[in-house]
Amino acid sequence: MNTRFLDACWGKPVDRVPVWLMRQAGRYLPEYMAVRSRCTFLELCKTPELAAQVSLQPVDILGVDAAILFSDILTPVEPMGMKLDFVPGPVFEKPVRCMADVERLRIPRMEDDLPFVFDIIRILRRELADRVPLIGFGGAPFTLACYMVEGKGSKDFVQIKRMMYSAPDVYAALMEKITTMSMEYLNAQIAAGAQAIQIFDTWGGILSPSDYRTHVLPHTTRLINGLNRLTTPVIHFVKGAGTMLETVREAGGDVIGLDWHVDLATARNQLGPGVAVQGNLDPTVLFAPQAVIEQQVQRVLDENRGLPGFIFNLGHGILPTVPAENARFMVQCVQRLSRS
């Protein structure tokens, strides 16, 4: 098996830097759009054969060093009792706003309520045949709470902050329930065959460092500590966390994901030894001429200074209108420029 990705997660030496892309199975690939044209997004997420097919596309087309389960961070929230639709973004029919709403939420029976997720994982492990490892994933408790309380996407998520400040008992009860659900969900992914886990805290960076430490850190720490991590590394990605990386590290995780607002050398200094890092090319670089893409890849590699425990990725998900050939070129640049 190509173990570069897993070796890098554990900080072991590798022959070159492993590379994969957040949202690598997505709309920038014509092959993905051909599948997506036949079904809705939710149908794609819930049809194991199709979801496995699009999960494999970046491995075959781009040559990345890891596959990631095709799903959505909100997938496990729906069976908690929240009707979800995508129109086109995620919308919950009835947001969580009070203690009664929290009390109505249930912890799903994972294999009964979400069998398609684990079927996708099992299909992928079979189809990958150990060519590359498989990453499972989930949303961090705070990011899931942002959507559940707001009811949809937002730039500032006022409702979750209002709850956090004005109804701390409701907020705490919600976060406890989401954390328990997430722990069971991610452990079920590991049991089904996921070989690494990424926790996406897309909205953790909307909080001040003080509020993150008080209102988010305890829940994320409980989640990470509750995962079956003996042979399964955990990647913890908090978008916008450049000013609080030391706190993010306190939550645990074997790899800290970085966005493009912090350079790798600075992040390494803040995080200290003993933890791997992943990132952190600005996704919009992939719209540039290929000569510029190569320069930017080299810059990121130089910032890492050849240290072990590094996984090349974008600083967030690949954008849907990026030319697929540029994504492939970026992967090739990493492979060529980082080989020891």
Swiss-Prot record:
Keywords: Cytoplasm, Decarboxylase, Lyase, Porphyrin biosynthesis. The record marks D72 as: Transition state stabilizer. GO terms for cellular component: cytosol. The keyword S-adenosyl-L-methionine does not apply. InterPro entries: UROD/MetE-like_sf, Uroporphyrinogen_deCO2ase_HemE, Uroporphyrinogen_deCOase. Gene3D superfamilies: 3.20.20.210. Pathway: Porphyrin-containing compound metabolism; protoporphyrin-IX biosynthesis; coproporphyrinogen-III from 5-aminolevulinate: step 4/4. It catalyses: uroporphyrinogen III + 4 H(+) = coproporphyrinogen III + 4 CO2. Its EC number is 4.1.1.37. Substrate binds at R23, Q24, A25, G26, R27, D72, Y147, T202, H316. The keyword Lyase applies. GO terms for biological process: protoporphyrinogen IX biosynthetic process from glutamate. PANTHER family: METHYLTETRAHYDROFOLATE:HOMOCYSTEINE METHYLTRANSFERASE RELATED, UROPORPHYRINOGEN DECARBOXYLASE. This is Uroporphyrinogen decarboxylase. It comes from Pelobacter propionicus (strain DSM 2379 / NBRC 103807 / OttBd1). The lineage of its organism: Bacteria, Pseudomonadati, Thermodesulfobacteriota, Desulfuromonadia, Desulfuromonadales.
